[in-house]
Amino acid sequence: MALELLTPFTKVELEEEKKESNRKQIGILGGNFNPIHNAHLVVADQVRQQLGLDQVLLMPECKPPHVDAKETIDEKHRLRMLELAIEDVEGLAIETCELERQGISYTYDTMLYLTEQHPDVDFYFIIGADMVDYLPKWHRIDELVKLVQFVGVQRPKYKAGTSYPVIWVDLPLMDISSSMIRDFIKKGRQPNYLLPKRVLDYITQEGLYQ
């Protein structure tokens, strides 16, 4: 069965709501993860802690509708880098349903599947503040907001407004991107401290992004 729409609670109201419920609270951070980097991990961990979620799932996309497929490496590498990145990390796991389904990854289709598979879970879909502005353009957005509670990661000095229910989480600015890391590697520069060392070692070993 589908989840009921959650209103845009404050964090305190959210905690009170969870105390009265036996349902699991699971966050989802989707992305191309090409490659995963430290900012991804900080977002996932801080949202989990600040909202008191049971777990956050990192969900690699198969064919995101907004990403150039030519820039995306094979999914086996992206998945392996995710596995390496969260080894021994509490509260983070991987959801592979979009990779298994193949095709274009629309959030509505994914969340409809997940809510049907896990009717005892409330899902929190994590997006950046810049993506909040684009919610009206998301595929089947009016139906999607009935399946998930959106969580917006607020950037310093960035003011996003939306009529859709969003819980806001404040995080320090981390100006790290996957494209930056790929560019470093292409130019022969080591992106030290921008991503987990195990992930960087894997990239070097496999000769990725050369």
Swiss-Prot record:
Enzymatic reactions: nicotinate beta-D-ribonucleotide + ATP + H(+) = deamido-NAD(+) + diphosphate
Q: Which UniProt key words apply to this protein?
A: ATP-binding, NAD, Nucleotide-binding, Nucleotidyltransferase, Pyridine nucleotide biosynthesis, Transferase
What GO MF terms are annotated? Answer: ATP binding; nicotinate-nucleotide adenylyltransferase activity
Q: What class of enzyme is it?
A: transferase
Q: Which InterPro entries did the record assign?
A: Cyt_trans-like (IPR004821), NadD/NMNAT (IPR005248), Rossmann-like_a/b/a_fold (IPR014729)
- Enzyme Commission no: 2.7.7.18
SUPFAM superfamilies, per the entry: Nucleotidylyl transferase
Q: Which GO terms describe its biological process?
A: NAD biosynthetic process
Q: Where does this protein act, in terms of pathway? A: Cofactor biosynthesis; NAD(+) biosynthesis; deamido-NAD(+) from nicotinate D-ribonucleotide: step 1/1
Which function does this protein serve?
Catalyzes the reversible adenylation of nicotinate mononucleotide (NaMN) to nicotinic acid adenine dinucleotide (NaAD).
List the HAMAP family hit by this protein, alphabetically: NaMN_adenylyltr
Q: What is this protein called?
A: Probable nicotinate-nucleotide adenylyltransferase
Q: Which organism is it from?
A: Streptococcus pyogenes serotype M3 (strain ATCC BAA-595 / MGAS315)
The protein's gene is named: nadD
